[in-house]
Regions:
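Acidic, contiguous N-terminal accessory segments
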Residues: 1-109, 321-334, 339, 465-482
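Short glycine/serine/threonine/alanine-rich loop segments
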Residues: 36, 137, 203-205, 325, ...
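Feature activates predominantly on carbohydrate-active enzymes
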Residues: 53-257, 261-274, 315, 319, ...
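Flexible loop/turn segments at secondary-structure boundaries
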Residues: 119-121, 147-153, 214-220, 276, ...
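Flexible, acidic glycine-rich loops studded with aromatic residues
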Residues: 326-343, 347-482
C-alpha cells in the first residue's frame, strides 16, 4: 500500500530519532546503508512508534514536518528504516512525502552463497550482507564445505583446513575449477565466523551454516582418511561432479566421531536455531560393496542403500536437537524415510518436489533451480557467463515464480524462498555482482510481495531507481534486458 502526498521532508545528515526502546542497533544499520549519522534523542524529527501490525509489518509516513514509522517491534521498525534508507538513496536529502504500509509474504527470505568451490573473503561477505539487508532478506545460507574445499576451521580436526581447504598439483585435493599452477584455497577462522555472525545480526540477518553430507565430502575425506575411509570398500560410483570418493560411510565409527565434533563446534559458532546438513546428490552405487555398510543394513533390517543415508541424517537430526538446533537439508534428506518432520526441506530440483514435501507435512523452503538459481546464465548468448544445466534464467523468469500457488492445500508449510548462487564460475567480486544483480531484486519481490502486488510492469518501473542505488554502492550488475 503506497500513497504519495504533497511536499518534501528535509533529511539532515545528523537527524535525531526517538522511540520506545534503545535504537543503537537499528540506527547503526540505517547509517551503514545511507552514510548518514542518525542518533537517538527525545527532541527528534523521526519517530518510531509502537502499533498493532503484523510482526514484520510497518507503516512509514513522511510529511514535510516529520517521519513516523509504526510497527509492532524491532523487525518492523527495521524494515521501515530500510525503506527510508532506499528512499534517501534515491532522493538525497529532500524526500518526497508518502505513506507506505507493508508486510512480507514469507518469513524466510534467503540468499545462498557457495564459498567452497571458490573462496570469498569476509569483506566480500559483509558487502553481500549489507546488500541483502537493503532488500529485506533475513537469511544468509552459507555453504562452507564441498568436494572442492573445506572452508570452516574446526579445532578438533585442524587437518580439515590444513589439507581440505587447499587444492592444487601434488596436493591431496587436486586442481580443479581455477587456480592455475599455484595452490588455491582459504578458510574462515572461528574468530572471523563470530565476527561475521555478529555483523549479520546487526543487519537483521541470521546466518545458516551448511555442512554438506554425506555426499560432497571429497575434501573432508582427503583430510581425514584414517577416520573416513573403509579400506575394504569396493563400491564403485561417480557423482554428478565426477568424484568417485566423495561420500561418507554411515557404518564407520570414525564418521560419527568426525560429524559429532563438527556439529559441536558449528553449534557453538552459530547462535541461530538452524543448521543445514546438505543431503543432496548421493550417487547411485555407493555403499553396495562396503562390508561395514552391508553389515549395518543386515543389523537394522534395511532393504535399500538409501536407508543408510536416512540412518546417518537421522543421527545428525537427533544430535542437533539435543543441542537445541533444527536440522535443515536439501530435498534428498527424505531418502530412506528416517528424518522426522521437524526437519525443514529445501526443494531445489522443482517446485513439485517442494509441494510434495509440504503436502507430507514437512516445512519447506522453495529454491527450485529453474526459477531461483542465480548461477544459471541469463541467456544462451555465447558471451553470457553462467551454467545451463537447468536452463537459462532472466529477470522476468525470476520475478514470475510463485512459491505457494493459491490452490495448494498445504501453503502453511511453505516458509519462504532461497536464491542460491553456486560458485564454480564465480572467480571475482565483479562476477559475483553480475550474477546476483538485478535478479536478486526479483527474488526479494517474490519473497516479500503477494501475487496480487507482484506486478511485473510495476517492478520494471521501479527498477531504474534501484539501479541508481546499486550504482552508488558500486555494484557491477548486469544491465537488465527482460
Amino acid at each position: 500500500h503506497l500513497i504519495y502526498t504533497e511536499g518534501n521532508f528535509r533529511l539532515a545528515e545528523r537527524a535525531h530519532v526517538d522511540g520506545p526502546v534503545p535504537l543503537s542497533s537499528l540506527l547503526a544499520h540505517f547509517n551503514e546503508l545511507t552514510g548518514l549519522a542518525l542518533t537517538q534523542d527525545h527532541d527528534a524529527e523521526i519517530h518510531l512508534v509502537e502499533a498493532t501490525l503484523p510482526p514484520e509489518g510497518y507503516e512509514l509516513t513522511i510529511t514535510p514536518e516529520e517521519i513516523v514509522i509504526r510497527a509492532a517491534g524491532e523487525a518492523g521498525w527495521r524494515h521501515g528504516l530500510v525503506s527510508l534508507a532506499q528512499w534517501a538513496r534515491q532522493h538525497g536529502e529532500s524526500l518526497p512525502c508518502l505513506t507506505v504500509r507493508d508486510a512480507p509474504r514469507f518469513g524466510f527470505r534467503g540468499i545462498f552463497l557457495d564459498c567452497a568451490r571458490h573462496f570469498h573473503s569476509i569483506a566480500t561477505l559483509k558487502r553481500l550482507l549489507k546488500q541483502m539487508s537493503l532488500y529485506k532478506f533475513n537469511r544468509f545460507h552459507w555453504h562452507l564445505t564441498d568436494d572442492e574445499g573445506w572452508r570452516l576451521e574446526i579445532k578438533a580436526f585442524p587437518q580439515l583446513t590444513a589439507v581440505g581447504a587447499w587444492r592444487g598439483h601434488g596436493l591431496a585435493v587436486g586442481p580443479q575449477l581455477s587456480g592455475g599452477l599455484d595452490p588455491y584455497g582459504g578458510y574462515y577462522t572461528q574468530s572471523e565466523v563470530r565476527e561475521l555472525v555478529a555483523y549479520a545480526a546487526g543487519l537483521g540477518i541470521t546466518i545458516i551454516p551448511e555442512i554438506d553430507i554425506p555426499g560432497h565430502c571429497h575434501a573432508a575425506i582427503k583430510a581425514l582418511p584414517e577416520l573416513l575411509v573403509e579400506e575394504a570398500d569396493r563400491s564403485r560410483y561417480l557423482s554428478v561432479q565426477y568424484f568417485d570418493d566423495n561420500v561418507l560411510n554411515p557404518a564407520l565409527p570414525g564418521t560419527y566421531e568426525f560429524l559429532d565434533a563438527v556439529m559441536d563446534e558449528v553449534c557453538d559458532l552459530f547462535p541461530g536455531s538452524q543448521v543445514h546438513m546438505g543431503g543432496d546428490e548421493v550417487p547411485t552405487g555407493v555403499w553396495t560393496d562396503s562390508p561395514a555398510c552391508q553389515q549395518l543394513m543386515a543389523e537394522q533390517g534395511y532393504q535399500d542403500c538409501r536407508e543408510l543415508q536416512g540412518h546417518l541424517l537421522r543421527h545428525c537430526q537427533q544430535y542437533l536437537a539435543r543441542k537445541g538446533k533444527q536440522m535443515l537439508g536439501w530435498e534428498e534428506i527424505l531418502h530412506g524415510d528416517k528424518v522426522s518432520r521437524e526437519a525443514t526441506v529445501f526443494a531445489w530440483t522443482s517446485f513439485q518436489a517442494g509441494l510434495d514435501a509440504a503436502a507430507s507435512g514437512y516445512p519447506v523452503v522453495m529454491a527450485p533451480a529453474q526459477h531461483l538459481y542465480l548461477d544459471l546464465a541469463w541467456s544462451q548468448d555465447i558471451h553470457e557467463p553462467g551454467l545451463y544445466w537447468a536452463g537459462t534464467l532472466n529477470l522476468a523468469q525470476v520475478h514470475a515464480c510463485d512459491p505457494a500457488p493459491a490452490d495448494f492445500h498445504a501453503n502453511d508449510n511453505i516458509l519462504g524462498v532461497l536464491s542460491p548462487l553456486w560458485s564454480e564460475l564465480i572467480t571475482s567480486r565483479d562476477r559475483l555482482d553480475y550474477m546476483l544483480f538485478p535478479r536478486m531484486l526479483a527474488t526479494a519481490e517474490v519473497a516479500w510481495s503477494t501475487p496480487a502486488r507482484k506486478v511485473w510492469e510495476h517492478f520494471v518501473a521501479r527498477l531504474p531507481g534501484q539501479l541508481h542505488i546499486l550504482d552508488q554502492l558500486q555494484v557491477r550488475y548486469r544491465v537488465p534486458q527482460r
